[in-house]
C-alpha cells in the first residue's frame, strides 16, 4: 500500500478499522452470552476490503 494515500481512502480504511472490533464485554454480560460473535468481523488476511 502506498505511503501517500488519498484522504477518502484513508477515511474508509479508518472506518473499517474502527468497525473491526470485538463485541463489548458489557453486551456479552447483558445478553447472558447470547450475543458472542460479531457477524461483520473481518480478518485482514482472509477478507479484503473493496478499495
Curated annotation (Swiss-Prot):
Residues passing through the membrane, by range: none
Gene3D superfamilies in the cross-refs: Ribosomal protein L39e
The protein, known as: Large ribosomal subunit protein eL39
Pfam families documented for this protein: Ribosomal_L39
GO cellular component: cytosolic large ribosomal subunit
Biological-process GO terms, alphabetical: translation
Keywords: Ribonucleoprotein, Ribosomal protein
Gene Ontology MF terms: structural constituent of ribosome
Cited HAMAP family: Ribosomal_eL39
SUPFAM superfamilies linked: Ribosomal protein L39e
Source organism of this protein record: Thermococcus gammatolerans (strain DSM 15229 / JCM 11827 / EJ3)
Protein family: Belongs to the eukaryotic ribosomal protein eL39 family.
Organism superkingdom: Archaea
InterPro entries hit by this protein: Ribosomal_eL39, Ribosomal_eL39_CS, Ribosomal_eL39_dom_sf
Signal peptide: none
